[in-house]
Amino acid sequence: IFESTSLPSAASSRGCLLEFTDANPVGCSFGAGSPSKTFVLLGDSHADEWSTPLAALADSEGWRMVTYLKSSCAVAKIPVFNIRLHRISSECAIWRSQALDSIVRLGPAAVIVVEFSSGYIQGPHSDLGEHAVDLTTWSAGLENSLRQLQAAGIPVILVRDSPTPATNIRNCLSYADWRGVPESHCATPRSLAVSSTITDAERSVAEAVPGVRFVDFSSIFCDRTSCPAVRGGIIVYRDRDHLTTSYAKNLAQPLKELLLPMMNSEATASAGPLQ
């Protein structure tokens, strides 16, 4: 269990997921040396989870992926309280602003946005207490950031965050193994793991901003009623809310089907060099 939940992502293994006190964005490149098209992965540690299948896709298709990733920092323009630093993260605000500016200068064929939405919004999955934002503030902040990309003519794929388990999956599976109880003991009801309120709010934001497409991959993680801890013999989560790199590889094909039309569009030009 420990080994299967400890494999780092493509981006984090190269130090591309910035820490809490880092403010200056770092663009990391993956894929082809002379790419036909470039796309960007933008977000927090929940976006980092997707870097492994996306890096493999960039390699296989002759594309370039550029990542802009920072732990515990929302793409949505909101004040983010960092519980480790015990304060509002000024580093997050600086990083977000500069990362968006860098992406606009880069001019990619598409930007994929993923973030731990339920971690920032008031509700059962946030540890921020009174510092979590309400849904209206979140939606307005998300729309603000997406409109900056839209104004530059950059297509955006807004991906609904992966479902959030009710417990630390690695600990739960270890305990289940010790007690001799089935893995299903660690499953989470879909109604709890997937907030329909947040899903609907983010879909509405995407519909309000031209050039933004909302995508929900929840069915890759859950069946109609439950989100298992193990699917197809693969552990889905490495902790309370992050995907294992092994399971994230299952996202390669649906991500390819999603990106191909955008990357092959004649309307999207090749991006320039990183600055």
Stretches found by the model and what they are:
Residues 1-275:
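Extracellular/periplasmic envelope-modification machinery, especially enzymes
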